[in-house]
Design a protein with these regions (language model features):
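Short gly/ser-rich anion-binding loops that grip negatively charged ligand groups
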Residues: 72-80, 110-117, 134
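Short pre-catalytic strand/loop immediately N-terminal to key active-site residues, enriched for Gly-Thr
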Residues: 107-111, 289-290
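Glycine/charged-rich beta-loop-alpha catalytic/anionic-binding loops adjacent to active sites
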Residues: 69-74, 98-109
Length: 339
């Protein structure tokens, strides 16, 4: 690879996701032993990466976290608590010479929208483009998961990376190491209604999912009956959600969201925070048909299917206080893109 033959700037952007059902079943060891089913949809909230080659230092800038880290050489890419995902990505996909790697997120930190998975996909896409390598979207997702879960040792499943790489609605099946990809083609009118009536809220409470994931999977490994039953319930709900979306059955989609949330709460006592409880009550008052936490729970975002236009309900929810923020929602048919 000859630096003078390459452009000096590379950009990538990848969407985050709403996990409609089955989340947690993509996480090992459950996904390896029993297989998982997840239904998710990419959304217009994205992670952004800019890679500028040049200079003497390896410089990392996380605008969303307000953190900057500089290394004199590749030897400085280990032993840091800061920005572990970015460090891990550059260890796996090094580029020649100095650079500045800048990241930005449309979502609050710890949102539960799969922001680290989307960021990982975008970073790997930018780095491989700089290395003149071409990867399929599935390979991008797989490599981004390896960066996060193995190299950076941040536990989690694969659904976030696949949503970010692919875009759109998908039914994903997991039997490690294999991932089955089944696009879900929704009736256009139903997709528009679903978008219009989905209310996405940030609880104003950030959370780090790693500790919760580790705690739940330890309970599963020691044979905890309640946790194991909840994981199987989540898997069944994932399969049912795919059918409800195909059938354009909004009421059933809403009920399954709530079913999923009940199973999710059975995984860990800290899954539902006081802020989440208050947000749920406000959403029900505003006409929620069903809803759940986005991602692993214990803070971050929640989303609800409303009886009517979510924009009308948003006013009631925000007026309930607690610092709740309503986030914009649009389905994203396009996955990761580079330029």
């Amino acid at each position: 690879m000859r630096r003078r033959d390459l452009p000096t700037e590379f950009h990538a952007s990848a969407p985050m996701r709403l996990d409609f059902a089955g989340g947690w079943t993509d996480v090992p060891p459950f996904s390896a032993r029993e297989g998982g089913v997840v239904v998710n949809a990419a959304i217009g909230v994205r992670a952004h990466v800019a890679l500028t080659l040049g200079g003497k230092l390896l410089r990392f800038v996380s605008e969303e976290l307000g953190e900057t880290l500089e290394c004199a050489n590749a030897g400085g890419l280990t032993g840091h608590d800061k920005l572990p995902l970015l460090m891990a990505a550059v260890r796996m996909f090094p580029v020649l010479g100095g650079f500045t790697l800048t990241t930005r997120s449309d979502a609050p930190a710890g949102s539960g929208l799969g922001s680290s998975g989307a960021l990982g996909v975008a970073v790997v896409a930018a780095l491989t483009r700089a290395r003149e390598e071409t990867l399929s979207r599935q390979d991008l997702a797989d490599h981004a998961w390896q960066v996060e879960a193995i190299e950076a040792q941040l536990p989690g499943g694969k659904q976030d990376q696949y949503a970010a790489a692919l875009g759109g609605f998908h039914r994903l099946t997991f039997r490690d190491p294999d991932v089955g990809i089944e696009p879900l083609t929704l009736d256009p009118a139903f997709a528009a209604t679903l978008e219009r009536q989905t209310l996405l809220c940030y609880t104003n409470t950030s959370r780090a999912s790693g500790a919760t994931i580790a705690r739940v999977m330890r309970a599963y490994e020691r044979g905890d009956r309640e946790v194991t039953a909840a994981l199987h319930g989540l898997k069944e709900t994932g399969a049912a959600m795919a059918e409800a979306l195909r059938a354009a059955d909004l009421g059933r989609v809403a009920r399954l969201l709530s079913d999923n949330w009940k199973h999710q709460q059975a995984l860990d006592p800290g899954m539902r925070t006081a802020d989440m409880e208050r947000l749920e009550a406000a959403a029900v008052k505003a006409g929620a048909l069903g809803g759940k936490a986005a991602g692993s729970g214990a803070g971050g975002c929640m989303f609800f299917i409303m009886r009517g236009d979510a924009r009308v309900a948003a006013k009631t929810v925000v007026e309930a206080g607690n610092g709740t923020r309503v986030l914009p929602l649009a389905w994203a048919t396009e996955g990761v893109r580079t330029w």
